[in-house]
Amino acid sequence: MSNVGFSATRGITSGAPDKVDMSLDDIIRLNKKEQQARRPSPGNRRPLQKGKVFVQGRPVGARARGQTQRGGGVPRGAITRAGVGRGRKIPPPVGRRRGQGVITGLAARKTAALQKGISPLNRPAINRKLQPFNNRSRPFNNQSRPFIQSAQYRQMQGQRRPYRQTDIQRGLNSTRPFQQRRRPLPPVQTQREARQATFLFRRGLKVHTQVPKPALTSIPPAPVRPRQWRTSTNSSGILTVSIDNPTAMTQSEPPCAWSLHPPAPTSSAPVKMKVEEEKKTEPPKGVPLQFDINIVGKPTAMTLNERFRILKDERVATAQTSKGSRFVTVG
């Protein structure tokens, strides 16, 4: 080290040295010592002087005081101190650990930006651990909706659920878990009949089942509709339409003629009489039409009334040709 540098180091302790005669290394060392002497220790921190400005790029002092008064003070949720920029949060102390699952920093800002368009009623909580237990039962925040009183909110809740009946035993204010109302399951007999009806329906047989009414319970069951008549959907259905025929038999057949279980014969003589009567009776004379029932559902240009009118006109025309032109048909 040169004599100039030695004299410069001696001048540091005595007073403000003259940096013109120093070397570059000595000037750097001198500046570091001055910065360490200016920096306050953590135990006894002195307030900043009035003339000091630009701590970490922010003005501190008279200018900053004017800005805080103009801008409305420290931003909410941010505790500031000297040497830290305005609006920056202080990290937690060394002794305390942050709880697991707490979203902080840029991730919290990102979730808040994603939930910007969601209603606060439907928005899930970002940090469940940060929510105080006492504030969960509050319906609304007083700062966001000060115009809704607690009595009005209770009235709104009552209007929102008018169908709920209060239980006399439990009381008005007691809470109970949500109970889903389900229909009671049908009895085994009904299920068996339904399976049998489906089995017979697939084979083209008519089935008409009456579902028995279940016993009255506390919950009123839904109305059960009886099963419809099920007919075969084959395309070979024949529809017989009877047109006015004075010679046809108008009296209906007795029930014993179409019953599946006729009464047992008592003697041989009445049986012969019944056989002779059955031979004498003739079936009603009608006009059998080969008619497909499935055509009704298909879009056709001709309706049933037009079809039957054409058949009637043909019958009248044949009658006129046989008897002469004595009748005039009026459509």
UniProtKB/Swiss-Prot annotation:
A motif (UAP56-binding motif) lies at residues 16-34. Pfam families: FYTT. Residues 166-175 have a biased composition (Polar residues). The gene is fyttd1. PANTHER family: 40-2-3 PROTEIN-RELATED (PTHR21038), UAP56-INTERACTING FACTOR (PTHR21038:SF2). It comes from Salmo salar (Atlantic salmon). Required for mRNA export from the nucleus to the cytoplasm. Acts as an adapter that uses the ddx39b/uap56-nfx1 pathway to ensure efficient mRNA export and delivering to the nuclear pore. Belongs to the UIF family. This is UAP56-interacting factor.
